[in-house]
Amino acid sequence: MWDDNGVDWAHFDLIVVRSTWDYPSRRDAFLSWAESLPRVLNAPAVLRWNTDKRYLAALGIATVPTTFLEPGDELVAPGRPFVVKPSVGAGSIGAARYDAGDTRARDHVRRLHSAGNTVMVQPFLDAVDHDGEVALHFIGGDFSHAVRKAAMLPLGGDPGEGLFVEERISATAPSEKELELAERTLDAVPFPRQELLYARVDLLPGPLVLETELTEPSLYLGYAEGAAERLAAAIADASRGR
C-alpha cells in the first residue's frame, strides 16, 4: 500500500504508481506521499494535475460536454439522460446515470457536495449503449494498444460504492479518427508525452474524450500481445535514467 509507513521508499530506484485506487478519499495525503518519493512515475506534478477531472476543461480538444458544479451550486438537469460523478474519483465510485427529470440526481449531487466534492454532469450519449467506449493506451508516449469497454452504468442505478462496476472488455483496433484524437489529447497535456510512462485516453462515440488517465489506469496488458513487455522495457529504461 502506498501509505504503508513501514516501506523504505528510498530503497527503490523507481516507484511506479499502479493500483492506488483509494486516493480519492484522501487525495492530499496521496499527493504529499508522491511528492516525498525520490523518483516516481508518473511524476508528482502529473498526478496532481490529473487527479481532478477539471483538467478536461483545459485540454482544448473535443471532450464530452461537462458542467462542473462546485459545492453550493444547484443541479439544472439536462433534458436527456445524464451522468453525475465526482471530479476526484477512481473506477465508478460515486458515479450514476439518470434519466431526464429523475429527482434522485439532485440528492446525489447534494451528497457529493456534502463530502466536499466538485460534481461533474455529463450527457449520456445514446451510442454508448451500443458502441461502449474505446480506451487507447500509450507507453512512453507511443501508442501501444486499445480495448473496447461496454457501457457500465445502468439507467437509474445506484451511485457506485465499490471501486468498479463490472466491466466487459475486448481487444480492438482504434479507428483513424480515434487514434488521431488520442494523439492530440496527449499533445495537449501540459507535460512532455515522452515523460509519461503510461497513459490511457478513454473515448466515447464521436469521438469525444471522456477521460485522460495518467494516474492509476488499468492498462489491460493481457489484451494485447507484447504490451506487458513494452511496459517492462519502458520501466527498465526509466530506472536507468534513459
Residue locations for each model-derived region?
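ATP-dependent carboxylate activation and anion-phosphoryl transfer catalytic cores
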Residues: 174-242
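ATP-grasp fold ATP-binding core
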Residues: 59-60, 66, 78-95, 116-131, ...
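A short beta-strand motif that forms the metal-chelation/ATP-contact edge
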Residues: 12-17, 85, 134-138, 205-218
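Short, solvent-exposed loop/turn elements at beta->coil junctions and helix N-caps
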Residues: 2-6, 72-73, 122-127, 200-204
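Short acidic/polar capping segments at secondary-structure boundaries
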Residues: 46, 71-74, 87-91, 101-103, ...
